[in-house]
């Protein structure tokens, strides 16, 4: 029996959460080795496990993979979630890059200065409503299929639905004007593997609060 992928990161969302989502959607059981201190991170660095001295790191198929995009590409390819040809992979890459851009904007709200938060949150909401969600609604409307690419579940669908849940935490009304996106969210969320991941007690991580942010600051020294 193949060993479970082992994920090295803190017990928080961060850069690892998309990897957790993708493995869960693929129905892959995983093991997590949490960093609990800066010394834990130093140990990984000192034993040569981190090529570029940073996490996330995933042990899978005899490799110690770092760099989030490389890890996601490998998992998507391994579990047939990365399209059937170069054109489909190009579309998946294009969509996921847009998703990453917006996800990073949302995550950065957590660490911005308190006096800037309201203005920056309003700007992010404006971009969600007027740039990103209309773009993905347009994609689905253009081909009237159940999934973003090739009428088949791909990494892009999973990544987008993960984003929907982050946006919902920010403002649950933002998706209301986009019926095809709402339908996609429901469709993906009801897949047995994803539905299981969305249940309490799974390896999905909760939103970051002040306590978990402080823990991250100590581990990653920022």
Curated annotation (Swiss-Prot):
The modification N6-succinyllysine is found at residue 4. Glutathione binds at residues 9, 45, 54-55, 67-68. GO terms for molecular function: glutathione transferase activity. The keyword Cytoplasm applies. The modification N-acetylalanine is found at residue 2. The keyword Protein biosynthesis does not apply. Residues 85-208 form the GST C-terminal domain. SUPFAM superfamilies: GST C-terminal domain-like, Thioredoxin-like. Expression not detected. Residues 3-83 form the GST N-terminal domain. InterPro entries: Glutathione-S-Trfase_C-like (IPR010987), Glutathione-S-Trfase_C_sf (IPR036282), Glutathione_S-Trfase_N (IPR004045), GST_alpha (IPR003080), GST_C (IPR004046), GST_superfamily (IPR050213), Thioredoxin-like_sf (IPR036249). It is an enzyme of class 2 (transferase). Its main location: cytoplasm. One of its GO terms (biological process) is glutathione metabolic process. GO terms for cellular component: cytosol; extracellular exosome. Pfam families: GST_C, GST_N. It is found in: Cytoplasm. Its EC number is 2.5.1.18. It catalyses: RX + glutathione = an S-substituted glutathione + a halide anion + H(+). Belongs to the GST superfamily. Alpha family. Homodimer. This is Glutathione S-transferase A5. It comes from Homo sapiens (Human).
């Amino acid at each position: 029996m193949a060993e479970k992928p082992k994920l090295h990161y803190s017990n928080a969302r961060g850069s690892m959460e998309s990897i957790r989502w993708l493995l869960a959607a693929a129905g892959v059981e995983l093991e997590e080795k949490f960093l609990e201190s800066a010394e834990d991170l130093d140990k990984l660095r000192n034993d040569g496990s981190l090529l570029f001295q940073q996490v996330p790191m995933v042990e899978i198929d005899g490799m110690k993979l770092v760099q989030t995009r490389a890890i996601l590409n490998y998992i998507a390819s391994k579990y047939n979630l990365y399209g059937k040809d170069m054109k489909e992979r190009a579309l998946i890459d294009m969509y996921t890059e847009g998703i990453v851009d917006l996800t990073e904007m949302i995550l950065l709200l957590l660490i911005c200065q308190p006096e800037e938060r309201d203005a920056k949150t309003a700007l992010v909401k404006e971009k969600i409503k007027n740039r990103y969600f209309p773009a993905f609604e347009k994609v689905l409307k253009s081909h009237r299929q159940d999934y973003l690419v090739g009428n088949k579940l791909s990494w892009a669908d999973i990544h987008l639905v993960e984003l929907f849940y982050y946006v919902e935490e920010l403002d649950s009304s933002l998706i209301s004007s986009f019926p095809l996106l709402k339908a996609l969210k429901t469709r993906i969320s009801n897949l047995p593997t994803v539905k299981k991941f969305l249940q309490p007690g799974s390896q999905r991580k909760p939103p970051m609060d002040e306590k978990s942010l402080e823990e991250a600051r100590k581990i990653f020294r920022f």
